[in-house]
Amino acid sequence: CTSRTDLPHISPREVHISYLPLAHIFETVVMNFCLFRGAAVGFYQGDTLKILDDLQALRPTIFVSVPRLYNRIHDKIVGGARAKGGLAGKLFFKALDAKLQRLHATGSGEHRLYDALIFSKVRRQLGLDRCAKMLCGSAPIAADVKDFLRVAIGAQFIEGYGLTETSAAATICHPDDVTNFHVGMPALCCELKLQDVSEMGYSSAADPPSGEVCVRGPCVFGGYYKMEVTRDYPRL
Protein backbone atom coordinates (compact mmCIF):
# COMPACT_ATOMS: atom_id res chain seq x y z
CA CYS A 1 0.00 0.00 0.00
CA THR A 2 2.82 2.42 0.78
CA SER A 3 4.09 2.07 -2.80
CA ARG A 4 0.66 2.91 -4.28
CA THR A 5 0.72 6.64 -3.50
CA ASP A 6 -0.11 7.23 -7.17
CA LEU A 7 -3.68 6.06 -6.58
CA PRO A 8 -6.32 8.81 -6.30
CA HIS A 9 -6.47 10.58 -2.95
CA ILE A 10 -8.60 8.54 -0.57
CA SER A 11 -9.61 9.94 2.81
CA PRO A 12 -11.14 8.22 5.86
CA ARG A 13 -14.51 9.64 4.76
CA GLU A 14 -14.55 7.54 1.57
CA VAL A 15 -16.78 4.49 1.08
CA HIS A 16 -15.83 1.70 -1.33
CA ILE A 17 -18.05 -1.17 -2.45
CA SER A 18 -16.18 -4.45 -2.92
CA TYR A 19 -17.85 -6.80 -5.39
CA LEU A 20 -15.14 -7.67 -7.93
CA PRO A 21 -13.40 -11.01 -7.24
CA LEU A 22 -10.78 -10.69 -4.50
CA ALA A 23 -8.82 -13.40 -6.31
CA HIS A 24 -7.99 -10.66 -8.84
CA ILE A 25 -5.28 -8.13 -8.05
CA PHE A 26 -7.32 -5.06 -9.07
CA GLU A 27 -9.92 -5.37 -6.31
CA THR A 28 -7.39 -6.66 -3.76
CA VAL A 29 -5.16 -3.60 -4.16
CA VAL A 30 -8.02 -1.07 -4.14
CA MET A 31 -9.69 -2.63 -1.09
CA ASN A 32 -6.45 -2.81 0.90
CA PHE A 33 -5.50 0.72 -0.09
CA CYS A 34 -8.88 1.97 1.16
CA LEU A 35 -8.38 0.17 4.48
CA PHE A 36 -4.81 1.50 4.66
CA ARG A 37 -6.19 5.04 4.37
CA GLY A 38 -8.92 4.43 6.95
CA ALA A 39 -11.79 4.42 4.46
CA ALA A 40 -14.88 2.23 4.81
CA VAL A 41 -15.43 -0.88 2.69
CA GLY A 42 -18.81 -2.49 2.14
CA PHE A 43 -19.22 -5.95 0.61
CA TYR A 44 -21.94 -6.91 -1.83
CA GLN A 45 -24.46 -9.68 -1.12
CA GLY A 46 -22.65 -12.15 -3.35
CA ASP A 47 -25.10 -11.90 -6.23
CA THR A 48 -24.08 -9.58 -9.08
CA LEU A 49 -27.71 -9.43 -10.21
CA LYS A 50 -28.44 -7.55 -6.97
CA ILE A 51 -25.54 -5.11 -7.25
CA LEU A 52 -27.96 -2.22 -7.84
CA ASP A 53 -29.64 -2.95 -4.49
CA ASP A 54 -26.22 -2.96 -2.82
CA LEU A 55 -25.24 0.35 -4.43
CA GLN A 56 -28.47 1.99 -3.33
CA ALA A 57 -27.97 0.74 0.24
CA LEU A 58 -24.29 1.71 0.56
CA ARG A 59 -24.10 4.79 -1.72
CA PRO A 60 -20.32 4.49 -2.23
CA THR A 61 -18.05 7.45 -2.93
CA ILE A 62 -15.63 5.23 -4.89
CA PHE A 63 -16.76 2.83 -7.59
CA VAL A 64 -14.32 0.38 -9.18
CA SER A 65 -15.34 -1.70 -12.15
CA VAL A 66 -14.47 -3.15 -15.53
CA PRO A 67 -15.64 -2.01 -18.99
CA ARG A 68 -18.29 -4.70 -19.23
CA LEU A 69 -20.25 -3.34 -16.26
CA TYR A 70 -19.66 0.29 -17.20
CA ASN A 71 -21.13 -0.54 -20.62
CA ARG A 72 -24.19 -1.99 -18.89
CA ILE A 73 -24.65 1.18 -16.83
CA HIS A 74 -24.37 3.28 -19.99
CA ASP A 75 -26.87 1.10 -21.86
CA LYS A 76 -29.32 1.08 -18.94
CA ILE A 77 -29.38 4.88 -18.65
CA VAL A 78 -29.52 5.58 -22.40
CA GLY A 79 -32.03 2.79 -22.99
CA GLY A 80 -34.27 4.14 -20.25
CA ALA A 81 -34.23 7.63 -21.78
CA ARG A 82 -35.06 6.27 -25.22
CA ALA A 83 -37.88 4.16 -23.83
CA LYS A 84 -39.44 7.23 -22.20
CA GLY A 85 -39.47 9.13 -25.47
CA GLY A 86 -41.50 12.31 -25.79
CA LEU A 87 -40.41 15.53 -24.13
CA ALA A 88 -38.56 13.75 -21.30
CA GLY A 89 -36.43 11.76 -23.75
CA LYS A 90 -35.63 14.82 -25.86
CA LEU A 91 -34.69 16.84 -22.80
CA PHE A 92 -32.37 14.06 -21.58
CA PHE A 93 -30.41 13.91 -24.82
CA LYS A 94 -30.31 17.70 -25.12
CA ALA A 95 -28.89 17.87 -21.60
CA LEU A 96 -26.42 15.08 -22.37
CA ASP A 97 -25.16 16.86 -25.51
CA ALA A 98 -24.76 20.14 -23.63
CA LYS A 99 -22.76 18.49 -20.85
CA LEU A 100 -20.55 16.59 -23.29
CA GLN A 101 -19.79 19.80 -25.20
CA ARG A 102 -18.86 21.51 -21.94
CA LEU A 103 -16.66 18.56 -20.93
CA HIS A 104 -14.72 18.68 -24.21
CA ALA A 105 -14.43 22.48 -24.12
CA THR A 106 -13.53 23.05 -20.47
CA GLY A 107 -12.63 19.67 -18.94
CA SER A 108 -15.70 19.79 -16.69
CA GLY A 109 -19.13 18.42 -17.53
CA GLU A 110 -20.86 20.15 -14.64
CA HIS A 111 -24.11 21.94 -15.53
CA ARG A 112 -26.13 23.15 -12.56
CA LEU A 113 -29.50 23.21 -14.30
CA TYR A 114 -29.29 19.85 -16.05
CA ASP A 115 -27.62 18.19 -13.09
CA ALA A 116 -30.44 19.32 -10.81
CA LEU A 117 -33.26 18.49 -13.24
CA ILE A 118 -32.05 15.22 -14.74
CA PHE A 119 -28.75 13.70 -13.73
CA SER A 120 -29.17 13.96 -9.96
CA LYS A 121 -32.16 11.62 -10.32
CA VAL A 122 -30.14 9.21 -12.46
CA ARG A 123 -27.38 9.11 -9.85
CA ARG A 124 -29.82 8.47 -7.00
CA GLN A 125 -31.48 5.63 -8.91
CA LEU A 126 -28.09 3.96 -9.37
CA GLY A 127 -26.95 4.58 -5.79
CA LEU A 128 -24.07 6.68 -7.15
CA ASP A 129 -25.24 10.10 -5.99
CA ARG A 130 -22.21 10.38 -3.66
CA CYS A 131 -19.72 8.85 -6.09
CA ALA A 132 -16.74 11.12 -6.77
CA LYS A 133 -14.25 8.63 -8.25
CA MET A 134 -14.72 5.85 -10.78
CA LEU A 135 -11.78 3.54 -11.52
CA CYS A 136 -11.51 1.25 -14.52
CA GLY A 137 -9.07 -1.48 -15.53
CA SER A 138 -8.64 -4.98 -17.00
CA ALA A 139 -9.58 -4.02 -20.58
CA PRO A 140 -9.94 -0.91 -22.77
CA ILE A 141 -13.13 1.10 -22.40
CA ALA A 142 -14.76 3.00 -25.26
CA ALA A 143 -14.14 6.76 -25.18
CA ASP A 144 -17.83 7.60 -25.61
CA VAL A 145 -18.78 5.42 -22.63
CA LYS A 146 -16.09 7.02 -20.49
CA ASP A 147 -17.21 10.56 -21.38
CA PHE A 148 -20.85 9.62 -20.82
CA LEU A 149 -20.09 8.39 -17.30
CA ARG A 150 -18.09 11.53 -16.53
CA VAL A 151 -21.07 13.75 -17.28
CA ALA A 152 -23.90 11.45 -16.18
CA ILE A 153 -22.40 10.46 -12.82
CA GLY A 154 -20.37 13.64 -12.35
CA ALA A 155 -17.34 11.74 -11.06
CA GLN A 156 -13.67 11.64 -11.99
CA PHE A 157 -13.09 8.68 -14.30
CA ILE A 158 -9.63 7.16 -13.86
CA GLU A 159 -8.31 4.43 -16.14
CA GLY A 160 -5.14 2.40 -15.65
CA TYR A 161 -3.09 -0.41 -17.13
CA GLY A 162 -1.29 -3.19 -15.32
CA LEU A 163 -1.34 -6.84 -14.37
CA THR A 164 -1.01 -9.15 -11.39
CA GLU A 165 2.79 -9.09 -11.61
CA THR A 166 2.85 -5.28 -11.17
CA SER A 167 0.42 -5.20 -8.21
CA ALA A 168 -2.31 -3.84 -10.50
CA ALA A 169 -1.63 -0.44 -12.09
CA ALA A 170 1.67 0.13 -13.88
CA THR A 171 0.22 3.25 -15.50
CA ILE A 172 -2.64 5.43 -14.30
CA CYS A 173 -4.45 8.49 -15.62
CA HIS A 174 -4.45 11.75 -13.69
CA PRO A 175 -7.89 12.26 -12.09
CA ASP A 176 -8.35 15.63 -13.85
CA ASP A 177 -7.28 14.38 -17.29
CA VAL A 178 -10.39 14.04 -19.48
CA THR A 179 -8.59 13.09 -22.70
CA ASN A 180 -9.05 9.61 -24.14
CA PHE A 181 -7.19 6.85 -26.01
CA HIS A 182 -4.42 6.39 -23.45
CA VAL A 183 -3.95 4.79 -20.03
CA GLY A 184 -2.03 7.56 -18.35
CA MET A 185 1.51 7.97 -17.10
CA PRO A 186 3.78 5.44 -15.38
CA ALA A 187 2.81 4.88 -11.76
CA LEU A 188 5.06 6.54 -9.19
CA CYS A 189 6.18 3.16 -7.88
CA CYS A 190 7.69 1.91 -11.14
CA GLU A 191 9.62 2.69 -14.31
CA LEU A 192 8.58 1.65 -17.81
CA LYS A 193 10.48 1.17 -21.05
CA LEU A 194 9.73 -0.20 -24.50
CA GLN A 195 11.99 -3.07 -25.49
CA ASP A 196 12.52 -3.54 -29.24
CA VAL A 197 11.20 -6.81 -30.69
CA SER A 198 12.79 -6.95 -34.13
CA GLU A 199 11.21 -10.24 -35.19
CA MET A 200 7.76 -8.67 -34.75
CA GLY A 201 8.69 -5.31 -36.26
CA TYR A 202 8.43 -3.45 -32.94
CA SER A 203 10.84 -0.54 -32.47
CA SER A 204 10.97 2.10 -29.74
CA ALA A 205 12.50 4.48 -32.31
CA ALA A 206 9.49 4.23 -34.63
CA ASP A 207 6.76 6.86 -34.92
CA PRO A 208 4.71 6.00 -32.96
CA PRO A 209 7.04 3.90 -30.79
CA SER A 210 6.19 0.25 -30.18
CA GLY A 211 7.72 -2.65 -28.31
CA GLU A 212 7.44 -4.99 -25.36
CA VAL A 213 6.45 -3.10 -22.19
CA CYS A 214 9.02 -3.72 -19.45
CA VAL A 215 8.33 -2.64 -15.86
CA ARG A 216 10.59 -2.40 -12.81
CA GLY A 217 10.11 -1.03 -9.32
CA PRO A 218 8.92 -1.99 -5.82
CA CYS A 219 5.42 -2.84 -7.10
CA VAL A 220 6.78 -5.65 -9.32
CA PHE A 221 6.41 -9.11 -7.79
CA GLY A 222 9.42 -11.17 -6.70
CA GLY A 223 8.60 -14.34 -8.62
CA TYR A 224 6.02 -17.05 -9.19
CA TYR A 225 4.97 -19.55 -6.54
CA LYS A 226 7.15 -22.69 -6.72
CA MET A 227 9.30 -21.04 -9.37
CA GLU A 228 11.70 -23.96 -9.56
CA VAL A 229 8.82 -26.25 -10.57
CA THR A 230 7.06 -23.89 -12.98
CA ARG A 231 9.98 -22.07 -14.62
CA ASP A 232 9.62 -24.08 -17.85
CA TYR A 233 5.90 -23.26 -18.17
CA PRO A 234 4.86 -20.69 -20.82
CA ARG A 235 4.63 -17.13 -19.51
CA LEU A 236 2.19 -14.45 -20.60
Model feature map: region roles:
Residues 1-15, 22-116, 152:
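Conserved AMP-binding/adenylation subdomain of ANL enzymes
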Residues 15-17, 214:
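Short, well-ordered beta-strand segments
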Residues 19-24, 138-140:
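Conserved AMP-binding
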Residues 114-236:
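Conserved AMP-binding/adenylate-forming
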